[in-house]
């Protein structure tokens, strides 16, 4: 039943000790809102069928009933995903934490001129001319607006100055955002996971870093707890009566 799946996003996981960029599993996410309209019939049928063969079974990745790490299909890295569902932040909220916010500056992938050499080595100047463009006097962004990680990954290494190293560098630049914008919701911002390990974070002032820590801690460890609890209960309780 294709209508039950969101093919514009892929499921994955945020970074952990095993994967610094997170994971992108490549398969679509469930459209729980659609599933709920007919009482989760698709899930009920699955459970009923399994009950014909097993007395008990374990649901793997049970956290998927609470929330999923969703990544737009135009991206590859788990760093560019966010929890779904999740209560996104507004510009007003972000500023209330004391973090200086400009939508374009915070959501576009930007790399400081001082970091180009570290990312691209001796090819920095050529890469900058071909694949980047100035954002302001200090920062560069990707050369074209719709130049996403999937486009970068599709580049032919033999046709790119610096080959695979340059492609990896461009993939890294694509993750250099402060906030991920929720698909279809221009004013809904999610803090980029592990932003503290980005090149951009190093250019923040001490006060800006403290503000980021406050909003990041709230978003990832407090803000969505009640939402996820209610989401899981609304899905799991009806399914427990399936068999």
What name fits each language-model region?
Residues 1-243:
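Catalytic cores of glycan-processing enzymes that make or break glycosidic bonds
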């Amino acid at each position: 039943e294709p209508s039950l799946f969101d093919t514009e996003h892929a499921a994955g996981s945020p970074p952990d000790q095993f994967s610094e960029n997170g994971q992108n599993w490549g398969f679509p996410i469930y459209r729980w809102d659609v599933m709920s309209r007919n009482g989760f019939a698709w899930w009920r049928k699955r459970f009923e069928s399994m009950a014909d063969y097993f007395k008990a079974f374990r649901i793997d990745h049970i956290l998927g009933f609470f929330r999923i790490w969703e990544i737009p299909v135009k991206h590859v890295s788990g760093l560019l995903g966010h929890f779904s569902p999740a209560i996104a932040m507004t510009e007003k909220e972000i500023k209330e934490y004391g973090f200086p916010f400009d939508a374009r500056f915070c959501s576009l992938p930007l790399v400081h001129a001082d970091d180009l050499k570290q990312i691209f080595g001796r090819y920095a100047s050529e890469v900058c001319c071909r694949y980047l463009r100035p954002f302001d006097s200090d920062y560069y962004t990707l050369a074209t607006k719709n130049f996403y990680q999937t486009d970068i990954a599709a580049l032919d290494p033999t046709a790119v100055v610096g080959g695979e190293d340059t492609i990896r560098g461009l993939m890294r630049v694509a993750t250099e955002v402060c906030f991920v914008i929720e698909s279809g919701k221009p004013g809904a911002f999610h803090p980029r996971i592990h932003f503290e390990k980005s090149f951009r974070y190093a250019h923040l002032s001490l006060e800006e870093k403290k503000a980021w820590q406050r909003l990041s801690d709230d978003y990832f460890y407090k803000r969505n707890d009640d939402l996820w609890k209610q989401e899981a209960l609304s899905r799991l309780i009806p399914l427990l009566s399936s068999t």
